[in-house]
Curated annotation (Swiss-Prot):
UniProt organism field: Pasteurella multocida (strain Pm70)
Domain of life of the organism encoding this protein: Bacteria
UniProt catalytic activity: L-homoserine + ATP = O-phospho-L-homoserine + ADP + H(+)
PROSITE patterns: GHMP_KINASES_ATP
Cysteine disulfide links: none
Function: Catalyzes the ATP-dependent phosphorylation of L-homoserine to L-homoserine phosphate.
Cross-referenced InterPro entries: GHMP_kinase_C_dom (IPR013750), GHMP_kinase_C_sf (IPR036554), GHMP_kinase_N_dom (IPR006204), GHMP_knse_ATP-bd_CS (IPR006203), Homoserine_kinase (IPR000870), Ribosomal_Su5_D2-typ_SF (IPR020568), Ribsml_uS5_D2-typ_fold_subgr (IPR014721)
UniProt pathway annotation: Amino-acid biosynthesis; L-threonine biosynthesis; L-threonine from L-aspartate: step 4/5
Identification of the protein by name: Homoserine kinase
Keywords annotated in UniProt: Amino-acid biosynthesis, ATP-binding, Cytoplasm, Kinase, Nucleotide-binding, Threonine biosynthesis, Transferase
Main location group: cytoplasm
Enzyme Commission number, as recorded: 2.7.1.39
């Protein structure tokens, strides 16, 4: 039996729409992500589901992304004349669906890593990552790696998709705290993409390119202040903020409390606020608990960048 944990991720980081993402883990040691357990069977295949958010999963097994991961993995194995082993997969669904924290990526990554390890790792990291992106595209409507890449590999990942590399890890700022607030409501990735305009002004494109280039430069040259200042979004946030509860006021309040940057995590509704120290992070956490959460399913976590990515649990 093998248990694989895949951590939550925050995509875009405001400045890198579909090109940046980071894996995150709560500083209290709790697991913010999904777990997939795999075990051998005498014959056949079984899929089971458990976890706090299991009730949000599709009733039909064929619509479960873990089942689809199994089918895709099996198809790729057959192309190499390798038989899939009889097995049972159990998804522990601990991530809310449509949260902006890479919920589908967690399930996809945990499932494919478990399947690959169970079969003595026939696929390389890049081959596995390509499969992860394909599965993510089935849910969101387009292939993108800004959740699956950091969830799988850890760290802050920049999507390059050239010279045989899907992504490359950026050096980042270990001193930063990420305060992530999920309000308890759902925003589908497809809906959040549909709300975006079909075209942008030249000035918006230039601004976003300048911000992203400056952000990447700041990461490599260890300029934390510049990196934080460049975490701006003119591509998605102006349109997606309508899907989030009182976002503009909450964003301003977090900045007043000392946040270095505040933005939408992925397609929302989770938001992130970056704090320079633990004291500021705790103030932000308290504020967001009181002013952004909408129901009992909402939560706030103080996190750091997770540099491990998907991993086996003892």
């Amino acid at each position: 039996m093998l248990r694989i944990y895949a951590p939550a991720s925050s995509a875009n980081l405001s400045v890198g729409f579909d090109t940046l993402g980071t894996a995150v883990s709560p500083i209290d040691g709790s697991l913010l992500g999904d777990v997939v357990q795999i075990e051998a069977l005498p014959s056949g295949f079984e899929l089971e589901s458990a976890g706090y958010f299991v009730r949000k999963l599709p009733k039909e097994a064929q619509k479960n992304i873990v089942y689809q991961a199994y089918v895709l993995f099996s198809e790729r194995l057959k192309l190499r004349n390798i038989a899939v082993r009889p097995l049972r997969l159990t998804l522990e669904k601990n991530m809310p669906i449509g949260s902006g924290l890479g919920s589908s990526a967690c399930s996809i990554v945990a499932a494919l890593v478990a399947l690959n390890k169970f079969h003595a790792e026939p696929f390389s990291k890049m081959e596995l990552l390509e499969m992860m992106g394909e599965l993510e595209g089935r849910i969101s409507g387009s292939i993108h790696y800004d959740n699956v890449a950091p969830c799988y590999l850890g760290g802050v990942q920049l999507m390059v998709q050239s010279l045989g590399n899907i992504c490359q890890q950026l050096p980042f700022f270990d001193e930063w705290y990420w305060v992530l607030a999920y309000p308890g409501i759902e925003v589908s990735t497809a809906e959040a993409r549909a709300i975006l305009p079909k075209s942008y002004t030249r000035q918006d494109v230039i601004s976003q390119a300048r911000h992203l280039g400056s952000f990447v430069h700041a990461c490599h040259t260890r300029q934390a202040q510049l990196a934080a200042l460049m975490m701006k979004d003119v591509i998605a946030e102006p349109y997606r903020e309508a899907l989030l509860p009182n976002f503009a006021d909450v964003k301003q309040a977090t900045r007043d409390l000392g946040a270095l940057a505040t933005g939408i995590s992925g397609s929302g509704p989770t938001i992130f606020a970056i704090a320079p120290d633990l004291g500021t992070a705790m103030k932000l956490s308290t504020y967001l608990e009181n002013h952004y959460l909408q129901n009992n399913e909402g939560f706030v976590h103080i996190c750091k960048v997770d540099n491990q990515g998907a991993r086996a649990l003892d």
